[in-house]
A protein has these predicted regions:
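Arginine-glycine-rich low-complexity intrinsically disordered regions
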Residues: 209-227, 237-258
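N-terminal accessory regions of nucleic-acid-interacting proteins
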Residues: 1-48, 119, 130, 200, ...
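Short coil/turn segments at secondary-structure boundaries
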Residues: 160-163, 201
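Conserved DEDDh/DEDDy metal-dependent 3′-5′ exonuclease domain
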Residues: 25, 29-32, 36, 45-49, ...
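Mixed-charge, glycine-rich, non-catalytic linkers/tails in nucleic-acid processing enzymes
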Residues: 176-214
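C-terminal alpha-helical interaction module
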Residues: 233-236, 264
Length: 264
């Protein structure tokens, strides 16, 4: 029995723009001190699932990429905006991002983790990427804006995406945008999990094992008889050398006139 697909696989930009906007209405706390980070991580560690996102000041120069300026972590009613550009990357935050018991859900998680690794090497664990799991519900779209439109029927504003995330003070629009991006990931995951999958992932993924190529056997070298060295001539003994040295030198007889004429 096939399961009816509830969500549309794709949605156009025009359809997305016509939807009502969605925004986070809970408490937002901006963290830019070490003590504030400790308190935020302690609170977030008590939750089993939190929303996750990052922001980076845009660069308008080819080949230049800035480091992550902000990391957003949200529960259903409270969002922390952690300003990494104004404080160190604390171990409390590292432990939270490496904790497999606290699920962090976001979109394009792999890209965010790569960017965070420029600040501190992470053994990231407990992450769910909406882009990766969405196909299990027949959804082909990847962007957070379109995932929200398809799953929630709501539009996420992207007006502040290219704003300055290293500014001394955030605007109200920036705060709302950043908090909504992390929180809406929770809402999307909740809606997906309450809906039957049309392409369920296998219980256990079987890895394809590639047998190593066998090297061709080398034929054994033919056994050849060892080359026999030619018997070397015996070296003359010292006694023979001495006799040769003492042997009288015989002068050659001069040719007579008759022989000399014949030679000419």
């Amino acid at each position: 029995m096939s399961i009816e697909q509830k969500f549309a696989p794709t949605i156009t930009n025009e359809q997305t723009a016509s939807l009502p906007a969605i925004r986070f209405e809970g408490e937002v706390q901006i963290v830019d001190t070490e003590q504030g980070l400790i308190e935020a991580c302690d609170y977030l560690s008590q939750h089993s699932v939190i929303g996750f996102d990052t922001e980076t000041r845009p660069s308008f120069k080819a080949g230049v990429t800035n480091r992550v300026a902000l990391i957003q972590l949200s529960t259903s009613d409270r969002c922390y905006l952690i300003r990494l550009c104004r404080m160190r990357f604390g171990r409390e935050l590292q432990r939270l991002l490496e904790n497999p018991n606290v699920i962090k859900v976001g979109a394009d998680v792999a890209g965010d983790i790569r960017s965070l690794n420029q600040l501190r090497h992470l053994r990231a664990a407990g992450f769910i990427d909406l882009q990766t799991i969405a196909p299990q519900w027949g959804i082909e779209e990847k962007s957070l804006r379109k995932l929200s439109a398809i799953v929630l029927g709501k539009r996420v504003s992207k007006a502040q995406r290219l704003s300055n995330w290293e500014a001394a003070q955030f605007t109200e629009q920036q705060i709302s945008y950043a908090a909504t991006d992390a929180w809406v990931c929770l809402e999307i995951l909740s809606a997906l999990e309450s809906t039957p999958k049309v392409n369920p992932a296998p219980v256990q993924e079987v890895e394809k094992r590639v047998e190593p190529k066998k090297k061709p056997r080398r034929s054994a070298p033919k056994k050849t008889a060892p080359k026999q060295d030619k018997p070397s001539e015996p070296k003359p003994s010292n006694e023979a050398k001495e006799k040769a040295r003492r042997r009288p030198f015989r002068r050659r007889k001069p040719l007579n006139k008759k022989q000399n004429t014949e030679i000419k």
